[in-house]
């Protein structure tokens, strides 16, 4: 039987920008994506720590090294610049999966990897 397991998590990212009139998505610095094991186009669950909003969107690759986390389209209404968010990707598997987590500071620099 297939179960849903956490695969990747970017913990406590800071929202750096918003583009309301865009197709939609969350734009993540390419380096952060790679370190967390998240792919472009992958579906993610985003939790806003500041206001408890939760939403599902897909990832687009941001500029490597920019440390930017940008919300686009309707998702831009669910967080403000400076809000802290948790970004999670999941996978289907018949056996438990060891997830990869990166923890960020308020400048979106990696302070810990698990």
UniProtKB/Swiss-Prot annotation:
Entry protein name: Aspartate 1-decarboxylase
Catalytic residues, chain numbering: 25, 58
Principal subcellular localization: cytoplasm
Pyruvic acid (Ser), modified sites: 25
Co-factor binding comment: Binds 1 pyruvoyl group covalently per subunit.
Species this protein is from: Thermotoga sp. (strain RQ2)
Gene behind the chain: panD
Post-translation changes: Is synthesized initially as an inactive proenzyme, which is activated by self-cleavage at a specific serine bond to produce a beta-subunit with a hydroxyl group at its C-terminus and an alpha-subunit with a pyruvoyl group at its N-terminus.
Keywords: Autocatalytic cleavage, Cytoplasm, Decarboxylase, Lyase, Pantothenate biosynthesis, Pyruvate, Schiff base, Zymogen
Annotated EC: 4.1.1.11
Entry GO MF terms: aspartate 1-decarboxylase activity
Similarity annotation: Belongs to the PanD family.
């Amino acid at each position: 039987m297939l179960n849903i397991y956490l695969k990747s998590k970017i913990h406590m990212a800071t929202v750096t920008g918003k583009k309301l009139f865009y197709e939609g998505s969350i734009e993540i610095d390419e380096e952060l994506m790679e370190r967390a094991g998240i792919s472009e186009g992958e579906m993610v669950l985003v939790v806003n720590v500041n206001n408890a909003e939760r939403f599902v969107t897909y990832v687009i690759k941001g500029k490597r090294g920019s440390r930017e986390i940008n919300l686009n389209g309707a998702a831009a209404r669910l967080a403000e610049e400076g809000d802290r968010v948790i970004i999670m990707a999941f996978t289907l598997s018949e056996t438990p999966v060891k997830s990869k987590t990166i923890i960020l500071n308020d400048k979106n620099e990696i302070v810990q990897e698990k």
